[in-house]
């Protein structure tokens, strides 16, 4: 970013949790703030942006959830004899977490007064200041103070994280629980949007991190509707193939959330390709490849008329600080102590979180195979495995995994150990940083056997430490790295293994331990330069973002369509007497499906339409690209009080009428044979494609074809059709995974023009021209028009044109909202390019909105984004008031207890 004048570029850095933990003291009423563990690379990037070097150009604001707030517990003694004995016997270490949770049940620390919240916020900001000149009030906590604090992690950790790591955890009885966790996830993202709204200034860059905040980019687009708003998203975890991602029930909402960003980064190109594939298959988006500033491939995805550039940029580590922290006198003493404890033995080191994707079980099995295959190494090698407890501790799956690990450790030690020696030393705990760095220094080999992860910082840190010349002949000691780790695409000269093949891993261990010193050094000289630094990652991120933002400002209209104001819509609906509803069908009243014949109306849709149609003030028209037979079968036969228009306006059937009127009856239809033969040729070339032959229009569908192949042949087909259709006065229209040919003179807009400019409630005669001399009191005073694709833009354009005419002719007749009750509303993303005045996100929200009008849905259920208080309740709701009262009572009770 170029610093304009003396104003520094503001960056709002949104993290899932602040790099601090807030704890209530054990013996008094003081609040303690301690550094949080994990996400070391991300927090290093935050520190780097706060450094004097970067703070001259950037003003960083760190915004994040406080995390679970609990009571302070005494630190566990790590690496003591008690824990070592239990670990070596394969037993589980002490679980202080359980006792802590029991205490929290008795005394909830979450009832904070406003003064306490202000005080803790000031303490957090003091911790966030690295230089008073450059950082003033730059830490912004997101308060979500509710009992069962882990609820805010529920959807992210129990649904998203497993899916991103290729773990299917869905069960038949998880629906209601998952819905509740989804609502919490939405609230979590909305709380961030609210907090950002308090500090956002025009021109800010908003940098969003990882899967806790997938909805935030689009929420911010809708909230600010600022064309200069710049949003970047970085996904730190793996992104799975579409085969896995598509199992998520909320998959489209998640992708739509990310479409609000200007640019999205992933840890490697494979993850980026998976994301692009998911968008193409689930959002009907298009993509094109280009080269970024480094000459690497990037993708530009277009969906709903909005664009996002997708790139890969592996995160790095702070190499300078790591080496400074590692090579100290204190750690040198610990290194000597470890070497003395394992004199004459090769030391293999591993540190992994104990969960189902880090490969601890696979590593132990491979080590067991190694000892079996190479007896000469028995009593000569020790594996020190540190397994960090998972944040999701206590689940049945993790308990079984822990038991499995303990059984393997016991089995290996019994079979290959002795009274004086155990080949595996397993520590199930969080070890202090100095102990971890000591292990990196002393290791002869590090083994990373993860079955799925993003960037493994342990691997990067190990290689960096081994790049430093030391006194213990450890320079260049090798790294064995799983091919399923995202880091394998960075450290390409490491010993890459398949962790599921224990024999191959065993052979790699033997080879690594047998390397000569010269071979180790040659390997290190190749692999060390491949380690990315957090400084370079941060700089490259910001400079690349600058390029794409400049390009976006020059080439892309990023105006956001506001959400439909449903409370105002309901109020206007209740006061109006001549109401007209104009609905598209596919993608509006029903979701888009692979087979068009399968898009039948739901029972809920039929029920809502019946209730709307039963009101004599309402007139409802379905204006669809479907043919007459489909509309008759699924709508006309059930609801004769609906007006129907088929094939984008070629046919219509009035309310309570049986006969269809053909508006193209006098049009030359000889073109169909020639167009049909061309479509048949492309159908043969494209497996999964088919032709829908309507009475007037012909449509070539490729939704069931491979997306890349379908897009290619759709482009080729359009070129062929454009050549001949100009001679017949035909339109060649690109729809959602289809190409349609129909006469130019009929479209949905023409139908809408005749329906609106008409005596409300009277029989239609569309063969005659519209009656412009009608008084406005005879025409609709409430018109809701809903559609999702570009053919519906004709309807929106007509309504906008009608409103412009009415403003001139009937300027004294405007209603209390300053208009004429016309609501052109698109269905889709807020970033979609449209002439509509408002948007609803999907058919589900359409039904909720119509349900609101007929009393099936409450205003609260339909209202969309809401404001939350600090405990996650809707502001000013009954639950919010009760919570505030309980907080006051609790604070008073606590003060009295301390006085006593």
From Swiss-Prot:
Cofactor(s) required for function per UniProt: Mg(2+)
Keyword Calcium attributed: no
CDD domains given in the database record: GT20_TPS, HAD_TPP
Catalytic activity: alpha,alpha-trehalose 6-phosphate + H2O = alpha,alpha-trehalose + phosphate
UniProt keyword annotations, A-Z: Hydrolase, Magnesium, Metal-binding
EC number(s) recorded for this UniProt protein: 3.1.3.12
Spans annotated as Disordered: 76-109, 874-900
GO molecular function: alpha,alpha-trehalose-phosphate synthase (UDP-forming) activity; metal ion binding; trehalose-phosphatase activity
One GO CC term on file: cytosol
Biased segments, Basic and acidic residues type: 82-108
Pathway terms, separated by semicolons: Carbohydrate biosynthesis
PANTHER family associated with the record: TREHALOSE-6-PHOSPHATE SYNTHASE, TREHALOSE-PHOSPHATASE
Family classification: In the C-terminal section; belongs to the trehalose phosphatase family.
Function of the molecule: Phosphatase catalytic subunit of the trehalose synthase complex that catalyzes the production of trehalose from glucose-6-phosphate and UDP-alpha-D-glucose in a two step process.
Protein name: Trehalose-phosphatase
Biological source species: Zygosaccharomyces rouxii
This protein's encoding gene: TPS2
């Amino acid at each position: 970013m170029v610093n304009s004048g003396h104003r520094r570029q503001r960056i709002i850095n949104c993290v899932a949790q602040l790099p601090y933990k807030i704890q209530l003291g054990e013996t008094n009423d003081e609040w303690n703030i301690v550094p949080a563990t994990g996400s070391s690379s991300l927090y290093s990037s935050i520190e780097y942006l706060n450094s004097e070097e970067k703070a001259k150009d950037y003003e960083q604001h760190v915004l994040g959830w406080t995390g679970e707030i609990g009571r302070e517990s005494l630190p566990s003694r790590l690496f003591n004899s008690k824990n070592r004995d239990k670990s070596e016997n394969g037993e589980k270490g002490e679980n202080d977490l359980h006792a802590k949770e029991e205490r929290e049940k008795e005394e909830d620390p979450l009832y904070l007064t406003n003064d306490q919240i202000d005080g803790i916020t000031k303490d957090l900001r003091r911790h966030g200041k690295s230089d008073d000149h450059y950082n003033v009030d730059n830490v912004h906590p997101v308060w979500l103070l509710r009992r069962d604090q882990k609820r805010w992690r529920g959807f992210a950790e129990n649904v998203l994280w497993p899916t991103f790591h290729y773990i299917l955890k869905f069960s038949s009885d998880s629906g209601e629980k998952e819905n509740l966790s989804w609502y919490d996830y939405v609230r979590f993202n909305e709380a961030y949007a609210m907090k950002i709204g308090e500090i956002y200034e025009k021109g800010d860059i908003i940098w969003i991190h990882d899967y806790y905040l997938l909805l935030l980019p689009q929420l911010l687009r809708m909230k600010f509707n600022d064309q200069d708003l710049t949003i970047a998203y970085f996904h730190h975890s793996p992104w799975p193939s579409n085969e896995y991602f598509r199992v998520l029930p909320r998959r489209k909402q998640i992708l739509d959330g990310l479409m609000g960003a200007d640019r999205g980064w992933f840890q490697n190109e494979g993850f980026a390709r998976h994301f692009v594939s998911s968008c193409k298959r689930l959002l009907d988006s298009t993509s094109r490849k280009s080269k970024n500033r480094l000459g690497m491939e990037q993708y530009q995805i277009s969906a709903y008329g909005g664009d996002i550039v997708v790139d890969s940029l592996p995160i790095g580590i702070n190499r300078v600080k790591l080496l400074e922290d590692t090579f100290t006198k204190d750690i040198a003493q610990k290194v000597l102590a470890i070497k003395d404890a394992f004199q004459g033995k090769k030391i293999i080191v591993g540190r992994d979180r104990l969960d189902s994707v880090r490969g601890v079980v696979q590593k132990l099995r491979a080590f067991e195979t190694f000892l079996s295959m190479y007896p000469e190494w028995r009593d000569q090698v020790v594996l020190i495995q540190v397994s960090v407890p998972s944040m999701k501790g206590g689940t049945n799956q993790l308990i079984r995994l822990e038991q499995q690990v303990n059984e393997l450790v016991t089995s290996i030690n019994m079979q290959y150990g002795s009274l004086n020696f155990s080949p595996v030393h397993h520590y199930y705990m969080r070890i202090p940083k100095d102990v971890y760095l000591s292990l990196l220094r002393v290791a002869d080999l590090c083994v990373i056997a993860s079955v799925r992860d993003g960037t493994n910082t342990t691997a990067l840190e190990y290689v960096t430490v081994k790049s430093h010349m030391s006194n213990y002949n450890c320079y260049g000691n090798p790294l064995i790295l799983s091919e399923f780790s995202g880091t394998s695409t960075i450290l390409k000269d490491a010993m890459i293994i398949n962790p599921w093949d224990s024999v191959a891993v065993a052979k790699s261990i033997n080879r690594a331990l047998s390397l000569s010193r010269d071979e180790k050094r040659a390997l290190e000289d190749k692999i060390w330069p491949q380690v990315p630094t957090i400084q370079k990652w941060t700089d490259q991120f910001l400079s690349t973002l600058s390029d794409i933002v400049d390009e976006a400002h020059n080439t892309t209209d990023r105006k956001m369509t506001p959400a439909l104001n449903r409370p105002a819509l309901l109020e206007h609906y209740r006061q109006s007497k001549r109401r007209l509803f104009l609905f598209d069908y596919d993608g509006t009243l029903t979701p888009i499906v692979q087979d068009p014949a399968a898009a039948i109306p739901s029972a809920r849709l039929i029920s809502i339409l019946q209730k709307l149609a039963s009101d004599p003030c309402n007139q409802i028209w379905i204006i669809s690209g479907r043919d007459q037979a489909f509309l008759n079968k699924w709508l006309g036969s059930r609801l004769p009080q609906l007006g129907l228009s088929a094939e984008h306006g070629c046919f219509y059937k009035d309310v309570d009428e049986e006969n269809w009127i053909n508006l193209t009856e006098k049009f030359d239809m000889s073109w169909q044979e020639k167009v049909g033969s061309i479509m048949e040729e492309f159908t043969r070339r494209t497996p999964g494609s088919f032709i829908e032959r309507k009475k007037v229009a012909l449509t070539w569908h490729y939704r069931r074809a491979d997306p890349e192949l379908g897009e290619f042949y759709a482009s080729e087909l359009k070129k062929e059709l454009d050549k001949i259709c100009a001679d017949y006065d035909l339109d060649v229209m690109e729809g959602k995974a289809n190409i349609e040919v129909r006469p130019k003179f009929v479209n949905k807009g023409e139908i809408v023009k005749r329906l609106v400019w008409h005596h409300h409630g009277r029989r239609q005669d569309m063969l005659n021209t519209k009656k412009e001399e009608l008084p406005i009191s005879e025409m609709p005073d409430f018109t809701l028009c809903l559609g999702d694709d570009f053919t519906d833009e004709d309807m929106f354009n007509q309504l906008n044109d009608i409103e412009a005419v009415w403003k001139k002719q009937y300027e004294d007749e405007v209603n209390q909202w300053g208009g004429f009750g016309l609501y052109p509303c698109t269905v889709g993303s807020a970033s979609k390019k449209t002439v509509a005045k408002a948007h609803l996100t999907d058919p589900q929200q359409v039904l909720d909105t119509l349900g609101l009008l007929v009393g099936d849905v409450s205003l609260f259920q339909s209202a969309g984004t809401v404001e939350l208080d600090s405990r996650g309740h809707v502001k000013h709701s009954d639950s919010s008031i009760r919570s505030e009262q309980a907080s006051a009572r609790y604070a008073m009770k606590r003060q009295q207890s301390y006085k006593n």
